[in-house]
């Protein structure tokens, strides 16, 4: 194995360590506050948050628009498949690019591509009867850009802080992702209901300027390299994961959880309309989605604050059981009012699980393969969701909403028994050499 210099020796990383080098750090290592003390991380974090608000404006309106146009849960699943399906097919390519190309230039190029596609979406839906084929095609183009962008960004963010502060950085990244799920749907549903979907998509295109401007002004750490090429490089992440039982279990859990437990996310417009009496093209639907996002913010933030010193493997197992309980309750509801607090609880335990699981996965990863392993994570976290959503839509049409969500809950309980993620005392994580 050959490597370049450790990225933490890079000048931009020295800048990120100001709080430590000046000797006046008062934050507990590993907490969210400690992660925010690093300037480069803080700058990228804010830019990503603003951009993700626009992304979630678009995400929630795409699903609502699909249901509004057709009244079909299957077409909602098709749109979500176009949006998220590329994560399963292209994330490994994105991870390989993240570990071999200039990450800053790559992120900027992919952000510009997604912004242009959002403008195209706005043009496609201008008329009263937009082409469903074009809607799916342009949504697919957005999904392809995101599939290449996501593993790169996921690999960059933890490298902007020392390893000791990585849990806080991961927790904060989950917070900004889900805080944008609160703000974005509220703004998006309001604009959709009053001005139409085109203005939502244009707003998202403008929001990309926030992350582009940040990326133009900061320096990012250079990744090490393992020196491998071609298909061998593409499969490095898989080989590394197979040699680390903890990483492998994390990936099995996220793939299974996303495929079988998250159809409710993509089918939320159908659940809201059919079970709860909440029209997808309404502010009430935006508030429902925002409550889910707000719960996710609380759950993610709790991992870097209240539960910062708690065992993340144990939190993962307990969280899976709690998720099953709240999802079962949500699936049984037929009134809109109690749905808001219940989906808040679903969101809280959902992202407490995701954040704990991500922390376990990332804490011992070799930086030389971080992008490729995180590509596998993105494949599981986002790439399997559209398959579950599409299948969930078909099953909900045939058997109803409650039975499908009950099956999801049973799978979550089963995963709680499988998710034994504690590394044996004294056992070291594999190095990138084992991926060769």
Task: Kindly give the residue locations of the regions a language model identified.
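Alpha-helical transmembrane-bundle signature of multi-pass membrane transport and export proteins
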Residues: 2-436
